[in-house]
Swiss-Prot record:
Pfam families: M60-like_N, Peptidase_M60
InterPro entries in the record: Class_I_gatase-like, M60-like_N, Pep_M60_3, Peptidase_M60_dom, TCAF
Protein name per UniProt: TRPM8 channel-associated factor homolog
Function, in words: May play a role in the regulation of the cation channel TRPM8 activity.
Domain of life: Eukaryota
GO molecular-function terms, A-Z: transmembrane transporter binding
Family membership: Belongs to the TCAF family.
A single Gene Ontology CC term: plasma membrane
Organism whose genome encodes this protein: Danio rerio
Domain Peptidase M60 residues, every copy: 539-838
Length: 912
């Protein structure tokens, strides 16, 4: 890490810092990616710091006396600063600092007392007399010069009680561009050892300013934030010491926030449409004035934000539709481009204002697998400023403006809440009920923050170190079905443990605190797996029959045919995110993916898991081979390749805790315990091959699916008893029934086939929400009848003749309200069609839809099309039947079908 090397150079040869005496330093506030502490007291206050800006470097000391008290540090600092300009440069020293020059008389450095000149290589000055030359010093620093600035701001703040110290203290006019600020807080002194690494402390994770005055200005005349309507915003995460929330939903989600950055300011609005809303104009006008800081300069607004231009022009400022220019006072843009990222950051750091609007949720949805924190364009601009846009969504609403006193003292802020939790862990201080209620948000924010993966930032690495220490101090709950996680604190620790493991420099040291019981399973070396794939429009999981234990690392040798072609490795079959559940029986996310972007890839997963190759869509390979360096053998039966004898003799006893059965059209994955005593996997294969061919038969599809369906049985799933998708997820308790052939023929498998039916549903003949839980049951009915010989009356308790009759009567007695036509009630309509016309009619209807174009998007249009399609298949006018059921059959549909004989004696004719 570059910052660590900088620290070693600056503190070389120093064992301790004796700061005792009358000199009371300022506590320094650090922001951004480049600033790092050199000296920190036990209260977490930073008393010395260093940073980079442009091509130059800067060292900041919290009191001017330190310039003479620590000559060794000053010499180290000069050595560190000098490489930017060449070691033959002159060290300029402010006239009042003659003693500093005298201390350097015996050093190899050439010094010169006097005012700043840009010919100097380095300039040493106090923090009180730089205001007049601030612009020159910043330009000098940016061009590669070195600065040492020393002083304290607490006495200045006493003399200027109405002034904003962060903004107006003279020293901050210079060093703030590098992310270092003198604060009005007095630093506690003493004798402190110099740590080997950059100092950090949970106490240092604090907010650097009271934002009361800022909020008073921004919220003047603002009583509410009206974000009602169709605009869907993102959440803003506020993570910097000088960043603060402005507008927050009742459940604590920020959608407008501000920050100080360098000498400038920024406000982020999590939907660009908000900037042009009349209902938010009072706030927006305040915001643009806060950003302008009284300069009355030009406000540049990107040309596509015409509505924002209309609103902001009411401020009385000179608002112009223009691209970015350095001569602007405030720049207004969206977060969807980072084309001028560095220029915008520099513009703000050197005093400009930035109003940026946009959401990240659509980008996140269209860039699956990408990291919103590091890859979303707007976050390239915002992260350094202590703000970022998250990938989740926030609906609109009418939200009260925050009560300022309460917001400043009790409002949620990531840094202050993290500090409070660290205090709770290290000192046993009880959390208030309000703070307990914030733990879930803290866990989410910790995960988001860690995803920045900014390992060259001292601020980031200090949070990683803090969270690692918390994990070691508290431990992570050993979540399982017998030990579920329920309390907010346990939720938080599970979340933190999972996420910090991914980014800590030493994950192996954390592993025993996260997973305490890790069985030592026997492994295979250099396992070879042949890969064949011919994918259609979707990606496909390819099983390997191999498993990695929790935390186990391995290398995979990848054939050049698939390197860099969007192939991935996935570890773990449980892809459901159960983070929304109040009770957890496993961690929320337990799988991991790695791109195959080189011929040798290292993979691992905290929670372990089966190893899969993920073939991208529209890909064809035949027999390429991967080699897995070390892995655990899993029980894996594949029809046509695995013999029953081999299965019984040894494969089913393979040590991995997850097993797979792969058949012609279906792959099942579940706990190995469910198949240890399975003697006839071939009989299970025969059953499911028959079921799956029957499913494709009703769907009027070829008997071999383009992609095999998957079942995964897990201890907990994201919703429902089972749910459709790829894979279809179900609870572990359902797994034994999938392989019990005798029981299946006796009682059927309604639930599993219901989910397979969901995967056959097509939007062109679906009428959501009415038929969402209805038409999938056609496959359950068909399979039970054709495969199990179970008639509909016995296939499910909800469709006995008595239940059907009673439900139908209730529907029609209630006025055949289509809002009540759903699930079992809707299924009755389709069952009546099937009982009259048979299954072949459905097959023909589905077949016609395969290549149909011009299908309406609305339910009414689709229902009329369905009525016409079914009528033409059976050569009867079904309009009377569908009208009787309350379908919105249109006159032109009746006209189009009028040449066909009407089905007048249909089962609900008495209700027509």
């Amino acid at each position: 890490m570059a910052r660590e090397q900088d620290y070693y150079t600056l503190m070389s040869g120093m064992q301790q810092l004796d700061l005792q005496g009358k000199a009371v330093p300022s506590d320094l506030v650090l922001i951004g990616e480049h600033a790092f502490p050199l000296a920190m007291n036990p209260r977490g206050q930073v008393l010395m710091a260093a940073s980079h800006y442009g091509r130059g470097r800067i060292v900041v000391l919290g009191h001017e006396e330190y310039l003479t008290r620590f000559p060794g540090l000053i010499e180290n600092a000069i050595m560190w600063l000098m490489p930017c300009t060449g070691d033959a440069g002159v060290v300029g020293i402010q006239k009042s600092l003659r003693t500093v020059a005298e201390n350097l008389n015996y050093s190899p450095f050439k010094t010169e007392l006097g005012d700043f000149q840009d010919r100097f290589a380095i300039y040493i000055t106090d923090a009180y007399s730089v205001e007049s030359s601030a612009k020159d010093l910043i330009a000098f620093l940016k061009a590669g010069g070195g600065l040492i600035i020393a002083g304290q701001a607490w006495s200045w703040s006493y003399e200027h009680p109405q002034e904003n110290t962060i903004r107006n203290f003279p020293g901050n006019k210079v060093c703030s561009v590098a992310g270092i600020y003198f604060s009005e807080l007095e630093g506690e002194v003493g004798t402190f050892p110099v740590p080997r690494n950059i100092p950090s402390s949970w106490l240092a994770v604090a907010i650097g300013k009271d934002f009361k005055e800022d909020l008073e200005f921004l919220l003047e005349g603002v009583s509410e934030f009206d974000t009602q309507g169709g605009a869907i915003a993102s959440e803003v995460m506020v993570h910097g010491p000088l960043a603060f929330p402005i507008a927050v939903t009742p459940n604590g989600k920020t959608f407008i926030a501000g920050a100080y950055y360098g000498q400038g300011r920024v406000i982020v609005v999590s939907h660009e449409g908000y900037m042009g809303r009349d209902s938010l104009s009072s706030f927006m006008i305040n915001a643009i004035k806060w950003l302008d800081e009284g300069r009355k300069g030009v406000v540049g607004i990107v040309p596509n934000l015409t509505a924002a231009h209309t609103v902001l022009s009411k401020s009385g400022l000179d608002c112009q539709l223009t691209g970015f220019r350095e001569d602007l006072s405030v720049y207004v843009c969206t977060s969807y481009s980072d084309a001028q990222c560095a220029e915008i950051q520099e513009f703000v750091a050197e005093g400009g204002g930035l109003l940026i609007g946009g959401h990240a949720w659509y980008w996140a949805q269209t860039h699956c697998g990408s990291n919103v924190m590091t890859e979303y364009p707007g976050n390239h601009i915002l992260n350094k400023m202590g703000l970022c846009l998250l990938g989740n969504t926030l609906g609109g609403g009418l939200y009260k403006a925050p009560e300022i006193e309460h917001s400043c003292k009790h409002g949620y802020h990531f840094r202050s809440m993290l500090q409070r939790f660290a205090q709770h862990v290290s000192q046993g201080q009880e959390l208030t009920d309000r703070e307990q209620g914030c733990l879930k948000q803290l866990g989410t924010d910790c995960a988001s923050y860690l995803q920045m993966r900014c390992h060259d930032s001292a601020a980031y690495t200090s949070v990683v170190a803090l969270l690692s220490d918390i994990v070691k101090e508290v431990g992570v709950p050993q979540v399982c079905s017998n030990c579920p996680v329920e309390s907010p604190k346990d939720h938080l620790m599970l979340h933190i443990g999972t996420e910090v493991y991914k980014v800590t420099p030493d994950p192996d040291a954390l592993l025993p605190y996260i997973i305490k019981d890790r069985p030592n399973l026997p492994t295979l070396s250099n396992a070879r797996v042949r890969i064949t794939a011919n994918t259609g429009g979707c990606e496909e999981w390819i099983s390997t029959g191999l498993y990695l234990s929790p935390g186990m690392k391995t290398y995979i040798a990848v054939p050049p045919e698939i390197v860099g072609k969007n192939w991935q490795v996935q570890l773990g079959c449980q892809t459901d995110n159960i983070g929304g559940s109040n009770t957890l029986k496993r961690a929320p996310v337990v799988h991991a993916r790695f791109p195959l972007d080189s011929e040798m890839v290292q993979v691992w997963n905290l929670w372990g898991g089966l190893i899969y190759l993920i073939a991208p869509s529209q890909t064809k390979v035949d027999g390429v081979e991967i080699v897995v360096q070390n892995a655990v053998q899993a029980p894996y039966f594949k029809s046509g390749e695995t013999s029953v004898a081999d299965w019984v003799s040894h494969i089913r006893q393979a040590p991995a805790p997850w097993a797979e059965l792969e058949f012609e059209n279906l792959i099942m994955t579940f706990d190995s315990a469910f198949i240890r005593n399975l003697d006839r996997p071939d009989e299970v294969a025969k059953l499911w091959d028959t079921i799956m061919r029957t499913i494709t038969d009703l769907a009027a599809r070829p008997p071999k699916l383009p992609r095999k369906e998957r079942f995964v049985a897990d201890v907990q799933i994201s919703y429902g008893f089972m749910h459709a998708g790829y894979p279809i997820m179900m609870h572990s308790g359902s797994a034994p029934g999938l392989v019990n052939v005798e029981e299946a023929y006796k009682c059927g498998l309604w639930g599993a086939i219901h989910e397979l039916g969901h995967n056959q549903q097509r939007g062109v003949w679906e009428f959501p929400p009415h038929t969402t839980e209805c038409t999938c049951n056609l496959w359950s009915l068909y399979v039970h009848e054709q495969v199990f010989g179970i008639k509909s009356a016995n296939a499910h308790p909800a469709i006995t003749p008595a239940d059907r009759q009673a439900r139908t009567k209730m529907y029609f007695d209630g006025g055949k309200d289509l809002n009540s036509w759903c699930m079992w009630m809707a299924l009755e309509t389709y069952m009546q069609l099937q009982e009259k016309f048979g299954w072949d009619a459905f097959k023909k209807v589905f077949s016609l839809y395969h290549d149909m174009t011009g299908v309406p998007n609305d339910n009414a249009g689709k229902m009329n099309l369905y009525a016409q399609t079914f009528s033409k298949v059976v050569n009867l006018n079904l309009s009377p039947f569908f009208k009787a059921w309350g379908w919105p059959i249109q006159p032109n549909t009746e006209q189009n079908l009028s040449h066909l004989p009407a089905w007048s004696d249909h089962p609900v004719s008495q209700y027509a």
